[in-house]
């Protein structure tokens, strides 16, 4: 993880750690001139590692975004942001995307009153995300919510009730709330040149 954030910069979905300010300067000095391919590859890797996706999963999302109407890059980010594991991370119910994925896989999370154990489940507006009534589930979420540093910076497409361990998806995310310095068009270009 530390090698990844040193090379690609801060990835809040992967880890809460940040690269040291000097390491970024060293990377620029050491790397010399960066090719266009390398720049596109790094942007793609940022997206992959932030959301914790495999190459195949990301490629699938790029194909879905390409078929939809509108800007492919914006739609790609919206698809990734509306994943259940990422919504849990944004709500502060998990400290990282891998942590959120584990909560979902271990069946601690309910969407609209039903257990969902698929981290890639696509949330829709008006979905209500809660924890199971078991003490263990509530204790896990309570620890994350209490230690969540971005509680006051909750995106406007989400609402959380920390006392009832409940989150609400109000709408599809606006791109300014992504919180990741990324040029999504370079990711789309990377895949368009691969085929």
Curated annotation (Swiss-Prot):
The lineage of its organism: Eukaryota, Viridiplantae, Streptophyta, Embryophyta, Tracheophyta. PANTHER family: 30S 40S RIBOSOMAL PROTEIN, SMALL RIBOSOMAL SUBUNIT PROTEIN US4M. CDD domains: S4. GO terms for biological process: ribosomal small subunit biogenesis; translation. This is Small ribosomal subunit protein uS4c. Residues 82-143 form the S4 RNA-binding domain. One of the primary rRNA binding proteins, it binds directly to 16S rRNA where it nucleates assembly of the body of the 30S subunit. Its main location: plastid. SMART domains: Ribosomal_S4, S4. Belongs to the universal ribosomal protein uS4 family. One of its GO terms (cellular component) is small ribosomal subunit. Keywords: Chloroplast, Plastid, Ribonucleoprotein, Ribosomal protein, RNA-binding, rRNA-binding. GO terms for molecular function: rRNA binding; structural constituent of ribosome. It is found in: Plastid, Chloroplast. Part of the 30S ribosomal subunit. Contacts protein S5. The interaction surface between S4 and S5 is involved in control of translational fidelity. It comes from Romulea revelieri. NCBIfam families: PRK05327.1, rpsD_bact.
């Amino acid at each position: 993880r530390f090698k990844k954030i040193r090379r690609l910069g801060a990835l809040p979905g992967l880890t809460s750690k940040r690269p040291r300010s000097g390491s970024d300067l060293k990377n620029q000095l050491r790397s010399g001139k960066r090719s266009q391919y390398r720049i596109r590859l790094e942007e793609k890797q940022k997206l992959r590692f932030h959301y914790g996706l495999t190459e195949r999963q990301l490629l699938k999302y790029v194909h879905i975004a390409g078929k939809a109407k509108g800007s492919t890059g914006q739609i790609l980010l919206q698809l990734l942001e509306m994943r259940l594991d990422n919504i849990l991370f944004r709500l502060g119910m998990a400290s990282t995307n891998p942590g959120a994925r584990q909560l979902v896989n271990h069946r601690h999370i309910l969407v609209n009153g039903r257990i969902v154990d698929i981290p890639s489940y696509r949330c829709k507006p008006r979905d209500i995300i809660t924890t199971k009534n078991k003490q263990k589930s509530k204790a896990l979420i309570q620890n994350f919510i209490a230690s969540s540093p971005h509680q006051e910076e909750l995106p406007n497409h989400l609402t959380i009730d920390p006392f009832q361990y409940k989150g609400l998806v109000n709408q599809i995310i606006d791109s300014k709330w992504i919180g990741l310095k990324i040029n999504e068009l370079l990711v789309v270009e990377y895949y368009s040149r691969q085929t």
